[in-house]
């Protein structure tokens, strides 16, 4: 069987208005690949967090004028999503060390502010890598557990 790959690229302004467009595109890409509802919802949350972080932090010095690039690579058993910007970078390891682990008994009023998006992204996706060379690039992978829909080989003629 021949392996099938598709690649979809989006460029959107760094504005919160475009998060819903990206989520809709993601839903279509994941549905077409046969992903489960839960996988689609997990990926939508993770991508929303990553894009919102880029909108909120990457271009704050430039009055949020900038571009966010989104790539979907559909492979046989997984979908790789890459979100990148050319804005201000941050120290991923330092931020990550400040955000967790969370204690389930911790009073919600005293939870640390910030960084929860990174925690969610890592919790919901199967693989996450952050690069910070010129801007920030987040690469996320979700392994696809295909919906179990049987192919019905028997066809019934209806006249």
From Swiss-Prot:
Gene Ontology MF terms: ATP binding; protein serine kinase activity; protein serine/threonine kinase activity; sigma factor antagonist activity
EC number: 2.7.11.1
Keywords: ATP-binding, Kinase, Nucleotide-binding, Serine/threonine-protein kinase, Transferase
Catalytic activity: L-seryl-[protein] + ATP = O-phospho-L-seryl-[protein] + ADP + H(+); L-threonyl-[protein] + ATP = O-phospho-L-threonyl-[protein] + ADP + H(+)
One Gene Ontology biological process: negative regulation of DNA-templated transcription
Function: Negative regulator of sigma-B activity. Phosphorylates and inactivates its specific antagonist protein, RsbV. Upon phosphorylation of RsbV, RsbW is released and binds to sigma-B, thereby blocking its ability to form an RNA polymerase holoenzyme (E-sigma-B).
Protein family (similarity comment): Belongs to the anti-sigma-factor family.
Protein name as catalogued: Serine-protein kinase RsbW
Species in which this protein is naturally found: Staphylococcus aureus (strain NCTC 8325 / PS 47)
